[in-house]
Amino acid sequence: FDFQFRPFTKLYSTFGLRSDEHSTVGRKNSGRVTLAYLLDGNSKIRSSFGAGVRFPALYDYAYGDSTIVDKGGKLEDLQSERGLSFDLGYDTYLDNLDLELSVTLFKTEEKNSLLSNARTSWVIANASGVNTSEGIELSGVWKPVDKKISLNFGYTFIDSYDAATCDADEKASYTDGECHDKGSKLDSAKVRVPRHAIQSKINYSISPMLKGSLSGKYVGETRDFGNGNTGGCCFGYVDQILSDYYVFDLVTTYKIFNGFQATFNIGNILDEEYEQAYQYSSMGRTFNFGIRRIYWSHAKLINDFKKRDSSN
């Protein structure tokens, strides 16, 4: 169920609870609580706390010849994964600057992870470690009234920890090239989760018919696993640090007639070479041109509903 209530004039809150019955694991509960307090007409403080659950999948129960049953256990030995999340944020709108700003602090924890590694004897089982992520998100929208230009921007910092490969008992049970200590926070970070990420987008209305936008993003250095092609120790499975990169994209649209719209896009304008996963290169510079038909828009849909309601 989901219950929404307003205990005070400026305080809004919700409370949700869910109960799931699994044929093997049994009944598990999850839920979420949210609060929002209006400071004035333009600002508010918000927060939420939630607890989630993920039941074992068929893959976890039938992992080749490495199922828990094949190793002398029972299916009932596999428990659900559990997660907790908390965030605290502040939103405001600055009238004199036509600027919307938002800041959010967050933290998440995942435990009882289902995985197969040395400390589980290479059988799908629940590990004892706790994966964590915490950080801050900053975002803003600058949209001047009666102007042709607007700007969106955001920044995310994530300090994460990968318990699956970096907990002491895992490192003591098996020697490999994962989670080596070199004095960097990335050594124990979650795989493919950058510590720093920035994104921005400039929108410009050249005319009522022609619109364009230039977007860019920066992704900081990221940890990833090695593979058999890497070479060196541990059969090549040595952690890799993917380089940071910048990517810029251009999108333009032109309204032709009767709902038809022409689009012209340039992806990765600077032809940046980068990897989001180790030894998997991303696309270089691309050009796309197309024509599409728009049968309805959000504004038109609202007007149609208003006309229908007024006629009734």
Which sequence ranges carry the predicted segments?
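Residue-level signature of outer-membrane beta-barrel architecture
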Residues: 3-5, 19, 27, 37-38, ...
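Surface-exposed extracellular loop regions of Gram-negative outer-membrane beta-barrel proteins
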Residues: 1-22, 26-32, 36, 146, ...
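Solvent-exposed loop segments that connect transmembrane elements
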Residues: 59-75, 115-124, 162-187, 223-240, ...
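Transmembrane beta-barrel architecture of outer-membrane proteins
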Residues: 19-31, 49-53, 80-86, 105-111, ...
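Conserved C-terminal beta-signal and adjacent last beta-strands/turns
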Residues: 47, 142, 186-312
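Gram-negative outer-membrane beta-barrel transporters
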Residues: 6-10, 98-109, 127-228, 261, ...
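Transmembrane beta-barrel strands of outer-membrane/channel proteins
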Residues: 15-19, 47-51, 60, 90, ...
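Outer-membrane beta-barrel signature, preferentially recognizing the C-terminal barrel domain
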Residues: 38, 42-44, 51-110, 117-144, ...
